[in-house]
């Protein structure tokens, strides 16, 4: 069980580093955020089943719902930004120009 938890924590940290490194493109940032949410979901599910905390069994599903909402809003923003600016480079966006 320890090696699985360690692998999931490493996956979360790699996705976090991906967000920090590839923050110039919106699509790369969204993919790294999805990786972070997926590793958190799996880690939370494993910890709940390992420690027999069945009263918290709805928490991973709530996290998954928020992750899906975050992905939908992020993709809608990506489509809108790509349509108006022609690329998903974050540094080319000027928020005062709307």
Swiss-Prot record:
Its EC number is 7.1.1.2. GO terms for biological process: ATP synthesis coupled electron transport. Keywords: Electron transport, Membrane, Mitochondrion, Mitochondrion inner membrane, NAD, Respiratory chain, Translocase, Transmembrane, Transmembrane helix, Transport, Ubiquinone. The keyword Aminoacyl-tRNA synthetase does not apply. Pfam families: Oxidored_q2. It comes from the Eukaryota. One of its GO terms (cellular component) is mitochondrial inner membrane. InterPro entries: NADH_UbQ_OxRdtase_chain4L/K (IPR001133), NUOK/Mnh_C1-like (IPR039428). The chain crosses the membrane at residues 1-21, 29-49, 59-79. The keyword Membrane applies. It is a multi-pass membrane protein. It is found in: Mitochondrion inner membrane. GO terms for molecular function: NADH dehydrogenase (ubiquinone) activity. It is an enzyme of class 7 (translocase). It catalyses: a ubiquinone + NADH + 5 H(+)(in) = a ubiquinol + NAD(+) + 4 H(+)(out). Core subunit of the mitochondrial membrane respiratory chain NADH dehydrogenase (Complex I) which catalyzes electron transfer from NADH through the respiratory chain, using ubiquinone as an electron acceptor. Part of the enzyme membrane arm which is embedded in the lipid bilayer and involved in proton translocation. PANTHER family: NADH-UBIQUINONE OXIDOREDUCTASE CHAIN 4L, NADH-UBIQUINONE OXIDOREDUCTASE SUBUNIT ND4L. Core subunit of respiratory chain NADH dehydrogenase (Complex I) which is composed of 45 different subunits. Belongs to the complex I subunit 4L family. This is NADH-ubiquinone oxidoreductase chain 4L.
């Amino acid at each position: 069980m320890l090696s699985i938890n360690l692998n999931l924590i490493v996956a979360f940290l790699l996705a976090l580093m991906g967000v920090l490194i590839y923050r110039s493109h919106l699509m790369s940032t969204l993919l790294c955020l999805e990786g972070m949410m997926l590793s958190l979901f799996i880690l939370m599910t494993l910890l709940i089943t390992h420690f027999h905390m069945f009263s918290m069994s709805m928490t991973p599903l709530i996290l998954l719902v928020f992750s899906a909402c975050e992905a939908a809003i992020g993709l809608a923003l990506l489509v809108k930004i790509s349509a108006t600016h022609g690329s998903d480079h974050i540094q080319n966006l000027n928020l005062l120009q709307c």
